[in-house]
Amino acid sequence: MCIRDSKYLVEHLYSPVRRGLMDEIDWNDRLIGIKGSRGVGKTTFLLDYAREHFGADNKECLYINLNHFYFTERTLVDFASEFRAKGGKVLLIDQVFKYSGWSKELRYCYDNFTDLKIIFSGSSVMRLKDENPDLSGKVVSYNLRGFSFREFFNLMSGNSFPAYTFGEILVDHQEIAKGICSVGKPMAYFQDYLHHGFYPFFLEKRNFSENLLKTMNMMLEVDVLYIKQIEQSYLPKLRKLLYLLATSAPCTPNVSQLSKDIETSRATVMNYIKYLADARLMNILYPVGESFPKKPSKVYMYNSNLMYPIRPMEVNMPVSYTHLTLPTT
């Protein structure tokens, strides 16, 4: 069943954008974790790797989802052992946190199946090394983010502009801008990017706003409550906190008032804000030298797309243009 599922998914994969992270990863490592917020394309990224490095028919690489009912009675260790015995070399594991004891079994596979490479995906809320000592010093983790404006612009305009380093932009920004604008008009796509360009699922033939709203709720219900083991009864408080922060962001949070609004302690409010940031729903900014559990100086939405489902009638994003001028020496 798993082999048929993997082959089908790789064969029918629609992935028009090759993510830059693909070239940043050292694929020689034997245990690789791909973290990212819900909706940024972690599953697609794993399948992209399979298609690019092995193809759909090569049984040396296999994609599995640990949220499958198959793994309610079959252990990951047993499955990996059998896969390896049949010639398997690379195991791509999705939804790893849905499997009880996943970190211990990954460590067992790492220690005992030295000819097997494991690449797994996980939520941005997960602390792979801090909260999973079994993996400390073994796993190499990377973060997959949503589309950059460059990726969105390339996709929508049919171009293939490369990424530039900050140093290259500082030194040669005028020529870079001229080269881009000579074949495309990036600002014609910018408002669309602010509205729906961060999450790759805007390409699906579904209502984007409804899909994003469902994704945000899943971030709260699964990525925060499930992973952080918070009781379901506290979900309304977490949802209300997100709404209060979103409708006032960017802001310096009044923790005392927020604790009254959601009827919980100041310490719990601070924890919730941290969890929202871990889930990539919010960004939190601290003064230099400070960090959690201190109160952040500013709280704002993680990306502009998230503002529209919460404040659809209030979002106003004027676009300003500023030319970068460097001081002469």
Regions found by a protein language model. Give the residues of each.
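Accessory nucleic acid-recognition modules appended to NTPase machines
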Residues: 211-324
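Conserved lysine of the Walker
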Residues: 42
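Interdomain motor-coupling "hinge/lid" segment immediately C-terminal to the ATP-binding subdomain
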Residues: 131-235
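Conserved small/polar residues in nucleotide/adenosyl-binding loops
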Residues: 1-5, 322-328
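Short glycine-rich substrate-engagement loop in P-loop NTPases that contacts/grips substrate
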Residues: 62-86
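N-terminal pre-Walker A segment at the start of P-loop NTPase domains
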Residues: 4-21
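Hydrophobic positions on the alpha1 helix immediately C-terminal to the Walker A/P-loop
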Residues: 45
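Hydrophobic anchor at the beta1->P-loop junction of P-loop NTPases
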Residues: 34
